[in-house]
């Protein structure tokens, strides 16, 4: 690691926070697990060298997934920590040496598959399934009982041989077959595909409808047992779990020596491609439970366990063509069209090439036999070329000088090539899709498939056109039925009240992501102030450097961008300003939402409450100011009634949000 400045540190924190948001909240990762782990290690090293730089929001301060805010939070019976990762046999040897030094002798180990899924804790009372929790922060997790109960391989009742009360811990996952079925369904409905089985499983566990979760064919593999009836070894515990009806994946094995562990690691790596589910490594645990107790744990990890992670899977195939796509900011991105190949449980036919420089650096040519890997991304990447198979007639590939969509000349920037034609339909379609997406305005029923159809028939050609759509317009579109029309119009109406940071994200300002948009909203408070901000004002904000500041000034200096915002406002879009504490009528008041809202989505309601200074909690307590009860409200409503709390319906919430006053 070379010389690092505090700005570099802040930039790395910001980048990892965004990766966390995309991974845990959106289930749309844009980076492989390995790349993420390497960046996290770099951040940890910087914080060791410069503890004075450490910020309270650093990703190193958190463990596990962030609460979704949709489920009650419940304490774990004992800490549910993550397992530290190693990527080489040398690092594994260091774990062995460290363990043996702490114990004073060489223990036996057990070894099991590291399924790439979501960790859960499942409690049984009187041998009946009682509750399921996510890992959360390791101390508390979200109550996901309803969704976990849909797992068909999970026993609802345990046999008499099992203890009356116990807890198992395991990994919820989707098999490759179930994952392919789910993504096929997503494609048919015009929705985003899941990046990998793990993110599909995570998204399913966060669904509010257990009926919908049941359709997705989740599975569970148990990796731990907690009971008062102490057993001698971890391996014996897994055998008991299997006898009681739990699925325990992948032939756990006891190993008496380091060499046996290494041999088993290699055996599993060879059979990895034939497994029916995704694994990203193996977990090695000290087998004797008493030895585990002696070794204990750190604030984040168990000292008695380590995860050996394999390199991403790789396949060889033919690069048949390179096509160029136009992104939402006009950047031209080359994409490899591949001869279809099976990789990590799915059929792969495309790979990301990023930019011209990347192609030149790797000397990638059409017709090459290439090696592809699939990490956390939906689209895999080319990691190498089999030069022995290259044709003597192959030629270097060059980025086109004209936009492939509008055929206007493109501009070469430092790294990127950009179409600067503001009327280019290619970039505009991408921009509108992003504007309506979950990452931006989150307009339900307006996925990529619907946007493309509306764009192709000429009903929308800009983001503001979304808010001008009428029932008569949509009736002209083939395939649109009355119910889908009403659902879409209701979602668009709900999106007209938008938090400032959400709109700034949705505008696709080059180099401004969600974290940058939040920083702008927090600093300036109103859209007008952001639009009129000077370069110096922008650069005074932490996390906004010269490049980003210049991009913001350039964006708002363009007439067409200001005109687009003005038209949105004319069509009824209200940008919710970030209010100061003195101006915030809901400041310090805690709200809980339960049931289904009709006039706005839960996300929109939460954002509007927060924009007025309020807080949104996932659980009801004496400190709750009011519970917002939609249709089909459940246990939270009953608890609020028992505590004598104020209960609002959606109409009252809307009135107060519109009036910006609780009086």
Swiss-Prot record:
Entry EC number(s): 6.5.1.2
Taking every annotated instance into account, which residue ranges of this chain make up the domain BRCT? Answer: 581-663
**Does Transport show up as a keyword for this record?**
no
What reaction gets catalysed by this protein?
NAD(+) + (deoxyribonucleotide)n-3'-hydroxyl + 5'-phospho-(deoxyribonucleotide)m = (deoxyribonucleotide)n+m + AMP + beta-nicotinamide D-nucleotide
Which residues catalyse the reaction? 114
Residue sites binding NAD(+) per the record = 33-37, 82-83, 112, 135, 171, 285, 309
Q: What does this protein do?
A: DNA ligase that catalyzes the formation of phosphodiester linkages between 5'-phosphoryl and 3'-hydroxyl groups in double-stranded DNA using NAD as a coenzyme and as the energy source for the reaction. It is essential for DNA replication and repair of damaged DNA.
Task: Name the family.
Answer: Belongs to the NAD-dependent DNA ligase family. LigA subfamily.
Q: What protein is this chain from?
A: DNA ligase
The organism named in the record is Chlamydia trachomatis serovar L2 (strain ATCC VR-902B / DSM 19102 / 434/Bu)
